[in-house]
């Protein structure tokens, strides 16, 4: 560890004991397994929303709002949390709504409700109609509280073919194509696009400033805000916010980040690419649902996942990447690496009351 990082790690340990304790308490509260009985009415709706908010979102912005209305729950995009530098067309926002939709439907089934999701074009929202059904707590539902985006090196070992088939089956959708790339030449090609995309983003001041604004450099800030990217969730030390801002400028460089992603990709068992059949909001939601099932099934199997979306976020690279992986003119929506590896401290969520309208 560089001396500067070692020193700041020590400082964090001395300064943020209280913040770390609050963070541990917040983790237990956020990622808890709730009871499957005893909820009804608004309380049941709020519990389903809680599970929905455990879905991933770009920079952990939690870019959603939920409206409860008798037998329906509607998920709206929260455009006050948009990230115009990395996501100028709000693509990631609607993918995130899809992830939340899938979690909610899985949770509804566990609580004795069938959820049917439809995209409301007029309101750019997802409307989920709920009706009674025999309760079933599926493996995917049980995995919701354990799923995380694990931004770490994996063990480099291949995934068994039976497990790959389970991942493919979980992601299956009539409106989304999913590609699982596991051979080394294909992964090296993906890595090349990741490095190109990362270099472009790292040289984009607007992107860097936007990312920095969503980083929570210590547990106290992570708990206070309940959103964003907690530094320890990426394997980085916990430091005061003012010091984290200074360190960010020194250590967050194209060279360092590219070296990290080379290690991350080369230690991964494979890469999954998700592409909607059409390039519109409704299909982006479906991409999110497909990916979330994939991520939950991976969690069931003890497989970690993490986003490496640079090839689809940099517009000039996207069509070249699509051609390279055999998608032709279809827009690729998500690039996900997967493999077995460690868990990291989880990100937090805002309370349910903060996302209800």
What are these regions (language model features)?
Residues 2-357:
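Acidic, surface-exposed loops and disordered segments
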């Amino acid at each position: 560890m560089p001396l500067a990082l070692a020193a700041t790690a020590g400082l964090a340990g001395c300064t943020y004991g209280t913040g770390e304790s609050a963070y541990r308490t917040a983790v237990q509260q956020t990622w808890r397994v709730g009871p499957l009985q005893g909820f009804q009415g608004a309380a049941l709706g709020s519990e389903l929303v809680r599970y929905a908010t455990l879905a991933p979102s770009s920079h952990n912005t939690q870019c959603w709002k939920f409206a409860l209305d008798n037998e329906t729950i509607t998920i709206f995009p929260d455009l006050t949390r948009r990230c115009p530098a990395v996501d100028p067309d709000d693509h990631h926002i609607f993918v995130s709504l899809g992830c939340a939709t899938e979690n909610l439907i899985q949770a509804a089934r566990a609580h004795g409700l069938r959820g049917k999701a439809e995209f409301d074009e007029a309101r750019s929202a997802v409307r989920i109609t709920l009706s009674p059904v025999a309760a079933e707590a599926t493996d995917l539902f049980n995995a919701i509280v354990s799923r995380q985006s694990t931004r770490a090196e994996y063990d480099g070992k291949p995934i068994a073919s039976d497990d790959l088939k389970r991942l493919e089956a979980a992601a299956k959708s009539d409106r989304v194509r999913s590609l699982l790339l596991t051979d080394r030449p294909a992964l090296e090609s993906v890595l090349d696009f990741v490095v190109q995309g990362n270099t472009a983003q790292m040289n984009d001041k607007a992107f860097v400033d936007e990312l920095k604004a969503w980083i929570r450099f210590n547990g106290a800030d992570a708990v206070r805000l309940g959103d964003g990217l907690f530094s320890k969730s990426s394997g980085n030390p916990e430091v005061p916010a003012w010091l984290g801002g200074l360190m960010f400028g020194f250590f967050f460089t194209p060279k360092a980040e590219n070296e990290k992603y080379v290690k991350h990709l080369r230690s991964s068992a494979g890469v999954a690419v998700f592409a909607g059949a059409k390039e519109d909001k409704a299909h982006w939601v479906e991409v999110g649902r497909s990916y979330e099932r994939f991520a939950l099934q991976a969690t069931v199997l003890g497989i970690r996942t993490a986003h490496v979306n640079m090839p689809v976020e940099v517009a000039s690279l996207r069509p070249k990447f699509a051609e390279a992986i055999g998608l032709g003119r279809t827009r690729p929506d998500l690039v996900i690496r997967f493999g077995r590896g460690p868990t990291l401290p989880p990100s937090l969520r805002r309370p349910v009351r903060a996302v209800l309208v």
